Amino acid sequence: MPQSASVDDHGAQAPHPQIAAYLDALKFERQLSPHTLQSYTRELAVLQRLGAQHAANIDLTQLQSHHIRRMMAQLHGDGLSGRSIARALSAWRGWFKWMALRDAAVTANPVDGVRAPKSPKRLPKALSVEQAVALMEQLPGDDAETIRDRAVNELFYSCGLRLSELVSLDMRHVKAGAYESASWLDLEAREVQVLGKGSKRRTVPVGTKATEALAAWLAVRAQLAKSDAAPEDAHALFLSPRGKRLAQRQIQLRMKRNAIAAGVPADVHPHVLRHSFATHMLQSSGDLRAVQELLGHASIASTQVYTSLDFQHLAKIYDQAHPRAKKK
């Protein structure tokens, strides 16, 4: 017999008794945050609503995989993204797993083996070459912070570093007492040694413009340095006005502001410069494997997304140049 579900004063269906019990367990036993708990509540309400539509004659705990697949198909048909459906399936799977430990009648998890449809990969945003040059060259001011910001921008664009990798850089390799640099700049060799994701180390060359910008920054770095700084800050390549290692959030905020000052009409953040580096390198060289190594991707599949961007560039050139492709 299916358990009846009442309707609350606002016309919404009250939670299935076992869903209500599960939500209480998440709240009081697992102590999930209110935001996460709200997400579970929403996804399980969808399960209950769709269960009533697709299997009204059985209790929610007795749903089978074919019910779940039909419900997923409805969500997909309603326009939900693969990511949103995957989030719903995850919440449903958790509830059925919890139920299986408490109810002998629940002998299998109907969500196991059900996979959400894949969402199309979102292509990363990249600046045009002209926009990248403007961001590098049209930043007004000659104070220490502005000189530092120019060096930050140039290094991002020259090396394609992740934000976490850039802030971890020291001025040089240091091993003093308990402190040892994880990542560092070797200005003389014109390269950076980076400890990236998965503790994978790589060497990335630094271009001429970035080398010049870094030299200019190192010449004024002492203006922001503090004599009593801890080793973590004393050896940092980039400093805040308080003499601390420059924080990721500070870089993000200043880059956004500096982009506006440089007249770059784009939502610029550090990862946009990493994407721009990869896209422009691939357009110039066509060497996907080299770009993979420079970016520090463990798999070539992560780098292949840039081939789509490169094809867009080639298609645009084709449309502009081919006599039979030009729009009249």
UniProtKB/Swiss-Prot annotation:
GO terms for molecular function: DNA binding; tyrosine-based site-specific recombinase activity. The keyword Cytoplasm applies. Gene3D superfamilies: 1.10.150.130, Intergrase catalytic core (1.10.443.10). It comes from the Bacteria. Residues 122-319 form the Tyr recombinase domain. Coiled coil: none annotated. InterPro entries: CB (IPR044068), DNA_brk_join_enz (IPR011010), Integrase-like_cat_sf (IPR013762), Integrase_catalytic (IPR002104), Integrase_recombinase_N (IPR010998), Integrase_SAM-like_N (IPR004107), Recomb_XerC (IPR011931), Tyrosine_recombinase_XerC/XerD (IPR023009). GO terms for biological process: cell division; chromosome segregation; DNA transposition. Keywords: Cell cycle, Cell division, Chromosome partition, Cytoplasm, DNA integration, DNA recombination, DNA-binding. Its main location: cytoplasm. The active site is at 162, 197, 271, 274, 297, 306 (o-(3'-phospho-dna)-tyrosine intermediate). It is found in: Cytoplasm. One of its GO terms (cellular component) is cytoplasm. Residues 13-100 form the Core-binding (CB) domain. Belongs to the 'phage' integrase family. XerC subfamily. Site-specific tyrosine recombinase, which acts by catalyzing the cutting and rejoining of the recombining DNA molecules. The XerC-XerD complex is essential to convert dimers of the bacterial chromosome into monomers to permit their segregation at cell division. It also contributes to the segregational stability of plasmids. Forms a cyclic heterotetrameric complex composed of two molecules of XerC and two molecules of XerD. This is Tyrosine recombinase XerC. It comes from Ralstonia pickettii (strain 12J).
